[in-house]
Amino acid sequence: VAKLKVDRKGIEGAAVTVLEQNDGFGKKLLATGNGKCNLTNVKQDPQEYHSSQEEFPWRVICAFPLPETLKFFTGLGIYTKNRSGGLYPYSEQASAVRDVLYMEARHRKVKLKTRERVTGIRKERKLFHVSTETYTYQAERVILAAGGCASSVTGSGNDGFSLAQSLGHRIVTPLPALVGLKGVGSWFAKWAGVRFEAAVALLENDRQIAYQRGEVQFTDYGI
């Protein structure tokens, strides 16, 4: 995506290098939407995003808005279907999205480096020095896309926060935003994988303070 943006702006001679600590690309992408990869959402409204800085999430969304996102993926051959506001590839396979992104990166001569865990980033004058366990890269711009603490099996963790903090960014302590609920009973295992539409309300002193409608999925331990 970064290379596509650079090419569209007509920046001559710009080169993009991707540093990935895993032995392959897109592990977290493959898990998105339970393996079906929800690319984006049609319900893009400032009120849908919760932040102490109300303008920040919307500013990020506007930098790559829905029409441009759809145009980008359509240009790669990925057409979408709408499921309750979430947009998924027609194949409903996250691997299809990962594969076209990988092929497009190769086509645009992006340098893809695997097994390169970034250990430090520092800026000296106009250049960033990005250190890994084996080499130090230099770049005029750096996009830090290390992921958060969720799903450590994909290789993500606290590295991204530590690197951002080392560059002077203030870190807000991350909190779980999407968690499973463990239930009591052996019958859950029989329903594992079953999905259905449901509504959930949060009450405080018999007063409803939050309401959400969406998809619920049973697992072998709960929902």
Report each predicted region and the residues it spans.
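Short linear loop/turn motifs
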Residues: 82-92, 177-182
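Flexible, glycine/proline-enriched loop segments at strand-loop-helix junctions
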Residues: 56-60, 87-92, 146-154
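Hydrophobic anchor at the start of a short beta-strand
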Residues: 14-16, 80, 142
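Generic structural signal for well-ordered, non-membrane alpha-helical segments
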Residues: 50, 62, 66-69, 90, ...
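Anion (oxyanion) recognition and catalysis
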Residues: 3, 7-10, 74, 106, ...
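Glycine-rich active-site loop/strand segments that organize a redox cofactor
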Residues: 33-84
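Glycine-rich FAD pyrophosphate-binding loop
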Residues: 3-34
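Predominantly flavin-linked oxidoreductase catalytic cores and closely associated redox partners
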Residues: 24, 31, 95-96, 100-223
